[in-house]
Amino acid sequence: MRINPTTSGPAVSTLEEKNVGRIAQIIGPVLDVVFPPGKMPNIYNALVVKGRDTVGQQINVTCEVQQLLGNNRVRAVAMSATDGLTRGMEVIDTRAPLSVPVGGATLGRIFNVLGEPVDNLGPVDTRTTSPIHRSAPAFIQLDTELSIFETGIKVVDLLAPYRRGGKIGLFGGAGVGKTVLIMELIYNIAKAHGGVSVFGGVGVRTREGNDLYMEMKESGVINEKNIAESKVALVYGQMNEPPGARMRVGLTALTMAEYFRDVNEQDVLLFIDNIFRFVQAGSEVSALLGRMPSAVGYQPTLSTEMGSLQERITSTKEGSITSIQAVYVPADDLTDPAPATTFAHLDATTVLSRGLAAKGIYPAVDPLGSTSTMLQPRIVGEEHYETAQRVKQTLQRYKELQDIIAILGLDELSEEDRLTVARARKIERFLSQPFFVAEVFTGSPGKYVGLAETIRGFQLILSGELDGLPEQAFYLVGNIDEATAKAMNLEGEKK
C-alpha cells in the first residue's frame, strides 16, 4: 500500500528520468516493446502508451509486462483496446505494478481494472493506492481458528454454513435468485458484522452489471444521497473488454478487499462473478503469449493462476475476507479443468434450484445439493450437526416418496410416511425467508435470523410440537415464533 502525496505533481520531469521504449510489434491485445539496453522493466510492471492515432484521437493504453523475450524486448498485455496503436510509438515504464485506489473512497463507486471510476460521479481520492500484485499472507499471520460466518439466512447457516475467511461456490442458472442472494449477503454483513463488500464482475455482461448497480441503489446497499455510507465497492471487467482486463479485474477487487481487512480490520465479503471467466481470460492470454496449451486447451499455468488469487483470500488476525464465487460449469461437466481446479479451493457450495424457485420458495437454495466442510460436530457442535442431519434425512425421505405420491396420492402412504411428508413440507417452507433487499418488491419486511434461533425452530418442527399448524404459516417468516403467530392469525381469519 502506498500513501500518495496530495499534490500529484509530474511523476517524471525530464526525458532522461523516463524509461522509454518503443512498440516493435502488435498482435491484437499483445504488444512487443523494445527498451534501451540495461533498462528492461520488471515482470508485472505497468507500461503506458500515450499519443495520437492516425485520425488525431488521443490514445492512452496501459499494459502489463508478461514476458522478457531477450534482445531488449518485452511482451506486454493491454488492459484496453489497442485500436490506433502503431509501431514506433513511445511506451513509458511506470517502474511499478498496476496500482488502484483503496479505502473508504471506493465505497459506492464502480471501477474498471485500472481503478478508474466509470460511473460518471467524478474523480476518486487516489491518495491511498495499492499494487494489485501482492503475496498471500504469511502462515504466521493467518487465523487458524475454524469459525462459522453467520449470514442470518436460515438455509445457509443450518445446512451449508460458511467459514469465516472461507471460499464458497455459488451455482445456479439464470433467474433463480443469485443476484438477490448476493445483495442480501452484502446487506447482512454490513448490518450484523459492521463489514463491507467488494463485488468483482469478471467477464459479466454489461447489462447484468448495470442491473446489479440499479438494484443495489433501489435496495439501499448503495446510498445515492450519501455515497460514503454505501456498503459495497464494484469493480467490473466486462465481456467486451480485452482478456488482459478480464484476467486482472479479480485482482483489482481483491486488492480493495485486502485493504479493508488489513488496515481497517473489518470482515469483508468478496464476490467474484464469474470465476470461470477469470480462467477463460487467462487461457486467452496464455495462447496470445505463445504458451503450449494444456488439457482441454487451458493454460499450462491454470493451477498457479488460480492459487495466486485464492490464497490471498483468507482470514488473518486483523480481519477476514470471505469470498463467494459464482461458478459456471461448461456443458455441466464438473470434470472440466476450470471448475475442477476451483473446487479444490472451496470450503462450501451453495446450489440454487430452479424447482424451488418455481415453487416460490426463496432463497431457492437446494438443501440437499448444498454442502459445507464446516458441518462437523467438532466445529458447529452436536446440537447443530444433529438438527441439520435430521432435516436432511426428512427432506431426502420426502424426495424419495414424491413419485409414489404423484402416482397413488398421499392416502396410500403409511402413517409414519405421511407424518414425514407433512414435516418435510413445513421444513421446506420454513427454509424460505423474507429478504431486506427484496422489501421494495414484496412489501414484507426482511428478517435476519440468528443461528441459535434457526436451530431452535427446526428442532420444534422435527419434534412434532408444531404438527397441528398449517403449512402456509411457515412460509416466508423469520424465526419459529413468527410462524406460530402467523398460524394464530390464519386461524382467526377462518373464524
UniProtKB/Swiss-Prot annotation:
Its UniProt entry gives the catalysed reaction(s) as:
ATP + H2O + 4 H(+)(in) = ADP + phosphate + 5 H(+)(out)
Give GO terms: molecular function aspect only.
Answer: ATP binding; ATP hydrolysis activity; proton-transporting ATP synthase activity, rotational mechanism
Q: Which residues form the signal peptide?
A: none
Q: Which SUPFAM superfamilies match?
A: C-terminal domain of alpha and beta subunits of F1 ATP synthase, N-terminal domain of alpha and beta subunits of F1 ATP synthase, P-loop containing nucleoside triphosphate hydrolases
The UniProt record gives the binding positions of ATP as 172-179
Assembly and partners are described as: F-type ATPases have 2 components, CF(1) - the catalytic core - and CF(0) - the membrane proton channel. CF(1) has five subunits: alpha(3), beta(3), gamma(1), delta(1), epsilon(1). CF(0) has four main subunits: a(1), b(1), b'(1) and c(9-12).
Q: What does this protein do?
A: Produces ATP from ADP in the presence of a proton gradient across the membrane. The catalytic sites are hosted primarily by the beta subunits.
Tell me the protein's name: ATP synthase subunit beta, chloroplastic
Organism source for this protein?
A: Pseudogaltonia clavata
